[in-house]
From Swiss-Prot:
Signal peptide: none annotated. The keyword Isomerase applies. Catalyzes the reversible conversion of ribose-5-phosphate to ribulose 5-phosphate. This is Ribose-5-phosphate isomerase A. It comes from Methanococcus maripaludis (strain C7 / ATCC BAA-1331). It comes from the Archaea. Belongs to the ribose 5-phosphate isomerase family.
Amino acid sequence: MARTKKANDEVPTDSDSLKLKVAKQAAKLVKDEMVVGLGSGSTANLFIQELGKRIVEEELYIYGVPTSFDSRMVASTAGIPLISLDQCGEIDLAIDGADEVCKSTLALIKGGGGCHTMEKIVDYYAKEFIVLADEGKLVDSLGDKTPVPLEVIPFAYSTVLNKLLKLNTAPAIRSGSGKMGPVITDSGNMIIDVFMSIEDAEETEIMLNNIPGVLENGVFSKCDKVLVGTSKKVEILKK
């Protein structure tokens, strides 16, 4: 008798295969004795799993710096030794995913999973920051399809909303799934998603962070390289 497909069964998609392709490629970039920033999200999790396989098979001496509770759990399961940011001194390489990648500037929007604050700290402190994406994440200009997430201190959420409205953006408090009320980050803050067009990523990143009450935003203007999974190969984009 055939098994009835359940609503929560995961069916692999073309996007999933492209994510796995870039994850495998990225894992090969890690060298012995490196400290590696471990990003968060579906693509980053695949990278973490592939890196764990390399550590076991090749007996590599590597430490990972997780950017969320989720990446910490995935890394622990994969057998990657973990170290905190204040213990490592420096990070050799950070590997992370993205929600949008601007093809011309390699600026990013991240934070669909609400982890962008810790991701940005780790990614920006790394000597090299590499992003993994499937070709569907490439855009001509940031903000066309994906909102910019802001991590906001709960005390200031209403004033931040008012400020964003005055800037002619369309802000919305991110609601949780599986619970009533707003999404709460690993650091205990709220997420406001902002729909806006972005002409200059660096200026927008600075402007949003200058709003009192905003801890960090999901515009990443700094990225060294992007590995893009396509149906034919993994393309490498550089500035």
